């Protein structure tokens, strides 16, 4: 690793720590040439294969932006959205794949969004899964009701 101050081609790791979210490693380094210290952050790369075949880096912010639209007017905070995006990223990284299709990201958003807010879930699912009629909404609502019936302390729809 090049020193950002003197461009020396080597550095020594002084300290390594896992980040709070557990998805990256923060390393404190020292340059043997100039003696200055600097920090680096290392994360495993994760790429998204879009529907048109273009590959781009995974972005948690894109998840938040997409889900925020479904949550407009709902009692969902920015913190809730950040936690949802983190859960989605953790689920994706747990697969061990370095590339994931955009469709799979959408599928992994649905379960935590359903737990967060069922109305937002229906909005997101209606666009993502291409609901064409009231029958599609009724089927999704019926699935939510079945899930509520299976959960003893769930609120009624």
From Swiss-Prot:
Cofactor(s) needed: Zn(2+)
Cysteine pairs bridged by disulfides in the record: none
Cofactor note: Binds 1 zinc ion.
A Gene Ontology biological process term: negative regulation of DNA-templated transcription
InterPro entries: ATP-cone_dom, NrdR-like_N, RNR_NrdR-like
A Gene Ontology molecular function term of the record: zinc ion binding
Keyword vocabulary terms for this entry: ATP-binding, DNA-binding, Metal-binding, Nucleotide-binding, Repressor, Transcription, Transcription regulation, Zinc, Zinc-finger
Domain ATP-cone: 46-136
Record-linked Pfam families: ATP-cone, Zn_ribbon_NrdR
Entries under PROSITE patterns matching the protein: ATP_CONE (PS51161)
Zinc finger (unnamed) stretch: 3-34
Superkingdom per UniProt: Bacteria
Function of the molecule: Negatively regulates transcription of bacterial ribonucleotide reductase nrd genes and operons by binding to NrdR-boxes.
Similarity-based family: Belongs to the NrdR family.
Name the UniProt record assigns to this protein: Transcriptional repressor NrdR
Organism: Clavibacter sepedonicus (Clavibacter michiganensis subsp. sepedonicus)
